[in-house]
A protein has these predicted regions:
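C-terminal beta-strand-rich structural cap/linker in extracellular carbohydrate-active enzymes
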Residues: 407-427
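Solvent-exposed beta-hairpin/edge-strand motifs
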Residues: 385-401
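Surface beta-strand/loop "capping" patches
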Residues: 345-365
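The substrate-binding groove and active-site-proximal loops of carbohydrate-active enzymes
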Residues: 12-27, 104-119, 136-145, 209-218, ...
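Asparagine-centered strand-capping/turn motif at beta-strand->loop junctions
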Residues: 371-375
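Hydrophobic faces of well-ordered beta-strands that scaffold small-molecule active sites
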Residues: 45-47, 138, 167-169, 243, ...
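Substrate-binding/active-site clefts of carbohydrate-active enzymes
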Residues: 1-128, 132, 151-160, 177-178, ...
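Active-site-proximal helices and loops of the catalytic beta/alpha 8
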Residues: 35, 53, 125, 131, ...
Length: 427
């Protein structure tokens, strides 16, 4: 939406007109045409819903509709940003109040969603865009900074209008238990239900950026994945957990891994583990960016603008390493798209041994074995340990290379490599 603020306006989280596309990007009609064109290619559009704050230059700041339109303090007061205040059974109301009523940033006034007129205004604005631009999904920004009971009612209002629409919430917390608290259907002791079908796995992001540059240990390297997924019992639906390796708020994956093989390992995990992947533009070419570097992680994709020195949309405009990553991720995503076993199949994992972590995705029709070798050297894996899932399968095919793999006794995995094997697969 329009973000006509004096600074930081490029991030578009400080809306100044809920019914207007930022003119630097185009007109409303251009956005509609984008959605229609995407739909013609089988791509659905998702809208970012921000009920917590608006831009300081919004036109209503000149004539505030009511005294309680915003959360107002005698002097500027920021949020304490302690989202644990909602899940902490010992939390004080003072801390919860400051979390929700304190401002996220000085240039973004904190909206009082409990005001019924504001509630209806935002509801109608988002329904307008869903209808006008044929929006298929919603991402709710900074969900826990709202009064969460009001936010849940707001999300349910939209879901009542669009019962088949998925809603994912940004709940940037630090433990699986806290994340699960915000997934709809969880049996929370306080009875709270967020109405968010999907939640974002920020903890997995940390592990994806760390594990492949660490030595293997009890709780380092790939053991981090094992321990993380072992806590999935707290979630009501692991298929609707959104996974990612980076996004617009944090260092890009390329900051963590300069080694192409390690970078590819993180992408392989992203695409094959339970839940569903979010791909941030530039992941496919190792686009660089550091969060503290003047928001440098939000660099534009090379070739999208007429003054760009190269066009990374084409193979000729990409380096050898970029093409390697691009082709690898493309093959993984195509496989995932065409194989429900990676979309909603069950997952079974085995404790990492000797630097190798193995897990399976499986359903009644298909079994996929993912072998992660975090060693710098090739490692031989005895397949007998995994008999309960491999069963009597004698062959597998690595889905990105199409190479056949003999599963009868031992499999050799190159160093710093992930093998994604479809078992019992021949062509």
């Amino acid at each position: 939406f329009d973000n006509n603020d004096t600074n930081y306006s490029y991030h578009h989280y400080g809306c100044t007109d809920y019914y207007k596309i930022d003119p630097r990007l185009g007109k409303n009609e251009d956005y509609l045409r984008l959605s229609q064109t995407a739909g013609n290619h089988g791509i659905k559009m998702i809208i970012d819903v921000v009920p917590n704050h608006c831009g300081g230059s919004h036109w209503w700041m000149k004539d505030v509709p009511s005294s309680d339109w915003f959360n107002v303090w005698k002097t500027y007061t920021s949020s304490n940003y302690r989202m644990t205040a909602w899940t902490d059974p010992h939390a004080s109301e003072t801390d919860r109040y400051k979390l929700t009523h304190g401002w996220f940033a000085p240039n973004m006034p904190d909206l009082n969603l409990s005001n019924p007129l504001l509630y209806d205004y935002l509801k109608q604005a988002y329904i307008f865009w869903i209808e006008y631009a044929q929006i298929a999904g919603i991402r709710v920004d900074t969900y826990p900074y709202n009064d969460i009971k009001t936010a849940a009612r707001f999300i349910q209002t939209l879901r009542d209008e669009y019962p088949n629409m998925n809603v994912v919430g940004e709940c940037w917390v630090k433990t699986p238990a806290e994340t699960a608290y915000y997934q709809s259907g969880n049996n929370n002791k306080d009875g709270f239900d967020s109405r968010l079908q999907s939640v974002m796995d920020f903890m997995l992001k940390d592990k994806l950026q760390e594990a492949f540059k660490e030595n293997e240990g009890w709780d380092t390297g790939t053991a981090k994945f094992y321990s993380h997924f072992a806590q999935d019992f707290v979630y009501p639906n692991t298929n609707l957990i959104m996974n990612f390796v980076d996004n617009h708020d944090i260092d890009r994956l390329s900051t963590a891994y300069k080694n192409v093989n390690e970078y590819k390992m993180a992408l392989a995990m992203l695409v094959t583990v339970r839940g569903y992947p979010q791909i941030y533009y530039g992941n496919e070419i190792m686009l660089e960016g550091i969060s503290g570097d003047y928001q440098g992680h939000r660099f534009t994709f090379p070739g999208g603008w007429k003054n760009d020195k190269r066009d990374a949309f084409t193979p000729a405009g990409r380096t050898k390493e970029e093409n390697e990553v691009f082709d690898y991720l493309k093959k993984l995503l195509h496989y995932r798209k065409n194989n429900p076993v990676l979309q909603n199949g069950k997952m079974m994992q085995f404790i990492p041994e000797n630097g190798v972590y193995v897990f399976f995705r499986y359903n009644e029709e298909k079994t996929v074995m993912v072998i992660t070798n975090n060693n710098d050297h090739a490692t031989v894996l005895d397949t007998k340990r995994f008999a309960e899932r491999i069963k009597d399968c004698e062959m597998g095919v690595e889905v990105t290379s199409k190479q056949a793999v003999d599963m009868k006794n031992q499999v050799e995995i190159p160093g710093k490599t992930v093998l994604v094997l479809e078992l019992g697969f021949w062509r």
